[in-house]
Amino acid sequence: MKRNLLFILLLCVSLHHPKAQTGNNNYVKTTVPTVATTATSGLSVSNSITSYQYFDDLGRPWQTVQVGMNPSQLDLVTYQEYDAAGRSSAFWLPVNAASGNNGNPLSLSTVQSRSQLSSNYGDGKAYSKPVYEASPLDRVLEQYGPGQEWHNNGKRVKTEYLSNTADGELSCRWYRTTDTRGNVQVSIQSGKVYYPAGELYVTRTTDEEGTGISLEFKDKQGHLLLTRRKNGVIYHDTYYVYDSYGNLRAVLPPLAVDALAAAGTWTVATDGTGVLAQYAYLYKYDDRNRCIWKKLPGADWIRYEYDRGDRMIASQDGEQAAKSPALCTFYLYDIDNRPVIQGTCEFRGSIASLGSTAMLTSLKRSYDGKIIASGLENSGYNPNMTLYFPVVHTINYYDDYGFRSLTGFDNESYFPKESHLAGGLLTGTVTTLLDGSGKKLYTAYYYDEKGRPEKTVSSNHLGGYDITTTVYTFTGKPKTVTHVHTAMGKTQQTQVYTLSLIHI
């Protein structure tokens, strides 16, 4: 038995202090060429990015070495310590290794001495470190930031795990919510103003100075019920109220909480102080738990409708409802559930009737694939329901460039033919300016053979075009980005951005 214990202790010591030779450590080497190549043997730091990730005998990552990564082409080393229980302990900020390191791991003492150099941090405690509670839960009680000023002076973020009480700092009001004739009702029952003691989980966090205190209260289902911020002796509370299905029904910020402190029942209509209307966030749901009404502070209700496919098909805010005739915003989709048209139309009766079917559109094409100018504003899209006096705001096209036959895209000097397939990608948009002019802006998106954005051509409100062209490196990073801007009667402006690593 003693031999077994001795063996285990020796094993723990060996795992806690990994050896400093690459050949004696488990590692994964990753090399990413930055130029086209058929082999990695001849690559250097000038044309590749190489890193080593080292693992201890338990398979835990304890060090990462990025070869030649800093501007002086020195290795950049990140070190992770573990405590005796195998938990993450000190996590060191990256340090520069000495010249000629060649991807080898550093010992802890070397990392510490390198951190003290002025070329790194000039600090022997350049690491963050958690302090765990003495329990199998391994919860973090304290968190130190990098730097000896934090560690030597006990400056850390402190976390306490508590339960609520019936009064005092750890108390939580018991708000309830119901729907009454379409109104969201918030109430506190007489005799049940606060949650009973021990019903809620409370997490108290104190900042490094010991003055910034915040508390979070959660129920047994994990719902956040209260966030409490303490400013001196004053508490600022924000309450979150849920229904029996777990849907968020109300958010009460501090000014609303201060006014709704005693037992009572409130709705937007009956709240004589106007607190709910002015400060609260309120939500209503249908029998499928979809948000159908939303109220933001100081604003009127916003209404949402969905089709049988759970897609939002219409919305109406307070300003639209107040117009004569009333308006609503509609949303149309294609057969692949992609948004294709958004706009406004007259609101007649109930927009709920729109949800009785799936809001789809069909796209009319000629035999050669070109889109036929028909449907909503000659976009080619034909919805499967009646929209009264629709005004289209945005139109989206996907998969191909059949829309180039439509008005606005027929200038081949700026809108060239496609050069690669674009299946599943956004290829064109039409946007209507909302300044009352009715003018439209046209945009086409072009992609390379790998599906990366290669060229974007957009008409602008100045009677010209904006063209953005991107050239990629071998690794898929932007190498050059060229932006050309033209306007009617103005000189063409060209901007070229060149992006590169410092020494690659």
Language-model features: locations:
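Bacterial Sec-dependent N-terminal signal peptides
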Residues: 1-23
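Beta-strand elements of repeat-based all-beta scaffolds
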Residues: 5, 20-501
